[in-house]
């Protein structure tokens, strides 16, 4: 392996880790193994701390491929709680409002999900990395500032209802770059004349890379010790 020439690695991001923390950990392990102070490492698509699943990490010259990987379609398994919302649209923030769910049926959910397939407009969450006047939306939102984000055009290829167990539903989503599953949860809740927030999210695929192709971050150091590493000459 030659981490300077470039390697592409697949990880299952642990729960509560930021994407940045995963990159830092991998960079630290590689730098230590190679005995170098600097090695270029980056990820090809952020996952929220409360999400797990496929994260592609590129090293060295392979970081030039990050954009290519970002444009691959992604598949998620999402768990939504209906009848309640949070400011972050997930469990990062406490429930701020509750709504009725008595009128919701399985058929209603299935019909509603169909409306989200295809090209749609989605307003990103205020608690997101989108920029507003050069500042990250989540920095403004956490300070309590009003954040107004413009809708983005994106594509949902597939949505499938996997489990229906009110107030919880589980869905599989195949979508394009830039889709916020948290925002999709918000919109599904509204379309059901209720509310919803995300209680669990797993990214199961990025392009052809599946969850079963990924290694655990905690196993990386031991895995690295088993590899034949080419010496880096600056």
Model segments located where?
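Catalytic/RNA-binding core of pseudouridine synthases
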Residues: 1-234
